[in-house]
Amino acid sequence: MDTEKIESLVYQLLEALGEDPNRQGLVETPKRVAQMMAEVYEGIQYTNAEIAEMYGKTFEVDTNQMVVVKDITCFSHCEHHMALMYDMSISIGYIPKGRV
């Protein structure tokens, strides 16, 4: 991710909005926004397979009982507007097929 380019573009955006990016209170804003975007969009650099491998903490089981995982924090951004669209907690249940 090109955080320097993001900083430059945020600086230009502030100018386009009629703000003075050099005024006190905004001087560090381009850098802060670039850092925030690097954190929020970090996942786009990985494939689904790579993410599954990172969290590959599964083990074999011999059961047909439902597994429930509660209160999973989930958020997502709209790719068209780059705005936070979902910020929620979810719960899932599944019947394992040999692995949990």
PLM feature spans:
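Extended, low-hydrophobicity, polar/charged segments
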Residues: 88-100
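Active-site loop/lid in soluble adenylation, ligation, and acyl-transfer enzymes
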Residues: 1-87
